[in-house]
From Swiss-Prot:
Pathway: Cell wall biogenesis; peptidoglycan biosynthesis. Its EC number is 2.5.1.7. Keywords: Cell cycle, Cell division, Cell shape, Cell wall biogenesis/degradation, Cytoplasm, Peptidoglycan synthesis, Transferase. It is found in: Cytoplasm. Its main location: cytoplasm. This is UDP-N-acetylglucosamine 1-carboxyvinyltransferase. Transmembrane segments: none annotated. One of its GO terms (biological process) is peptidoglycan biosynthetic process. Gene3D superfamilies: Enolpyruvate transferase domain. One of its GO terms (cellular component) is cytoplasm. UDP-N-acetyl-alpha-D-glucosamine binds at residues 96, 308, 330. Belongs to the EPSP synthase family. MurA subfamily.
């Protein structure tokens, strides 16, 4: 992991070939670390990714009174009998996932103060559904001085229906309700594999949960949870990024460490674009021997096409044969990436939450800036398809979500270097 001012120099033209294995999911490990707050004792997480956000979450947990050790891919969390309830220190504001301590703290302490989180600049992501869910469980919530405050003498099960299948709200409500009195039903719950992973861990801690992976989750509250050991699910977004990188560079890449069913729609889309895709139990292979065909995409909550792979869909269509439309239905400001693609020569136009991409034969090199984790990765892969050498700046965003990104690309044959500022 590098510094804030590091940049990448990416020379285009290489055909990616070889194999790569994905680590545990960023969108899972941070929530699992928060779930460790629910039980006094030592919880161990394995297959953790070596990304910037894991030490940031460690700092959040340490600020709440935990002891946390990171040893390569293993994170060990020692949760005390008495937690601090106020997560209103600088580490909390640095990344979005810090808000997932709201539910566990309310459940354990009867009170939580969580600073409004930072993270990627990809649109408004309000906490209304998080707060509403806690209120339906019996808490009072308010926003004051840049923080969410939740208080509850006790939490009581409720029938909760989400307006939108928000991943973050589903996670916070799950963690708040596992020790609530009585039964909670959560309708229109998020169905993402990372939700299933969280429920698996909570169940191994003694929680009574049914229905994860479906739109309705039922939680029967228990009096107490116990610590556990848990292996983090593989990162489907990183795996999907490698899949698109193979297709865009007309490469041949085998990706391991991920169940291909978690990427069913992205892999089907790559087939439509002309790629050969072979799947096996714990991975897949993508081979592309020709220029991709333009393919329309629309992002939706799982099992739809993931918004986190939207930059890769735009990048693929930028060099494809034909015209395509990519529609963003999840985050309204995620097309900032398009401005940077235009610097690379992409022929695009934005209309509301649609972007029209007219494919060209080859992109051109320039200097571009990452605005978030996935946009940064998308720009690097697009630069691999450009003539000449592209400078990618603000790559600290990429370090937040992609372990050993440069090293993995180099192993696949890419000409990429990190320049340390």
């Amino acid at each position: 992991m590098g510094g804030v001012k590091d940049k990448f120099l990416v020379k285009g033209g290489a055909r990616l070939q070889g194999s790569v294995r994905v680590d545990g999911a960023k969108n899972s490990v941070l929530k699992l670390m928060a779930a460790a707050l629910l039980a006094e004792g030592t919880t161990t997480l394995t297959n953790c990714p070596e990304i910037l956000d894991v030490p940031l979450m460690r700092d959040v947990l340490v600020g709440l009174g935990c002891e946390v050790e990171i040893d390569g891919h293993t994170v060990t969390i020692h949760t005390p009998a008495e937690l601090k309830s106020d997560a209103d220190f600088p580490a909390v504001t640095q990344f979005r996932a810090s808000v997932c301590v709201l539910g566990p703290l309310t459940a354990r302490c009867g009170r939580a103060v969580v600073s409004l989180p930072g993270g990627d600049a990809i649109g408004s992501r309000p906490l209304d559904m998080h707060q509403s869910g806690l209120e339906q469980l019996g808490a009072t919530t308010r926003t004051q001085h840049g923080a969410v405050v939740a208080e509850a003498d006790k939490l009581v099960g409720a029938e909760i229906s989400l307006d939108f299948p928000s991943v973050g709200a589903t996670e916070n409500i799950l963690m708040a309700s596992v020790m609530a009195e009585g039964q909670t039903t959560l309708d229109n719950a998020a169905r993402e594999p990372e939700i299933v992973d969280l429920c698996r861990m909570l169940r191994s801690m003694g929680a009574d949960i049914e229905g994860e992976g479906s739109p309705k989750i039922t939680i029967n509250g228990v009096e107490k949870l116990h610590p556990t050991s848990h292996e983090v699910i593989g990162d489907r977004i990183v795996a999907g990024t490698w899949a698109f990188a193979a297709a865009m560079t007309r490469g041949d890449v085998t990706v391991g460490g991920i169940a291909p069913r978690y990427l069913h729609l992205p892999l089907e889309k790559l087939k439509l674009a002309g790629a050969q895709v072979d799947t096996f139990e714990n991975g897949f292979r993508v081979v592309m021997n020709k220029r991709p065909k333009s393919t329309d995409y629309q992002t939706l909550p799982f099992p739809g096409f993931p918004t986190d792979l939207q930059p890769m869909a735009i990048g693929l269509n930028a060099i494809a044969d034909g015209v395509a439309v990519v529609t963003e239905n999840v985050f309204e400001s995620r097309f900032r990436f398009v401005d940077e693609m235009q610097r690379l020569g992409a022929d695009t136009s934005v209309d509301g939450h649609h972007v029209v991409i007219r494919g060209i034969e080859e992109l051109s090199s320039t200097t571009v800036w990452s605005s978030d984790i996935r946009a940064g990765a998308g720009l690097v892969i697009a630069a691999l398809c450009a003539e000449g050498t592209t400078e990618v700046r603000d790559v600290f965003h990429i370090d937040r979500g992609y372990p050993n990104f440069v090293e993995n690309l180099q192993a696949l044959g890419a000409d990429i270097q990190r320049v340390v500022a």
